[in-house]
């Protein structure tokens, strides 16, 4: 005999939390993080965004280092972003600052960070590439990479702070590094939209800011280049037979 349930009453019982970490209304939409030296050059962009209805605020790295704790500067910045997400309900984060010099600067301070010679610090993962041929003597060529996803990945499952160092050994995002335990179970899902203007000088900041304002202040009809496109790509040599390489110059990738 087949029985069919036509109606059902469901009662949900739960305890309302004493504290809601996210306010009902947002105080800011966009927070810009940059060193104090870039503040004046960024002010036109802040004014432009506010005039467009995107509530924007600047937070300097100097302020963050004074107000927030962390094991290093990238973690201090990440704790500020977490605070801004919870207190201001921000939607976007714009990091401004790159490597100070391509010639004289040292991009990596230690296994985890580049801070000393960066206007805005970067987090290095400790993801080690395996050799292409495991039985060969080929050396590992990429011991870690820069990842700004670190700044956007604020929470683990369950709402805990995502440190990218789950085993607390002081090595962030470790995977495949000889002699180091892997950091398993990292979240890798961004909780806020984040980007970076990797500017190396005040002049570069001014140039980029002017371009952004100009782009957002004009319509497509005012931009003769708007319907033109340049595509730059490489050839993966999938069409290579011996030494006979054929290049496709007609199709789009």
Where are the language model's segments positioned?
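Cysteine-dependent hydrolase recognition
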Residues: 1-253
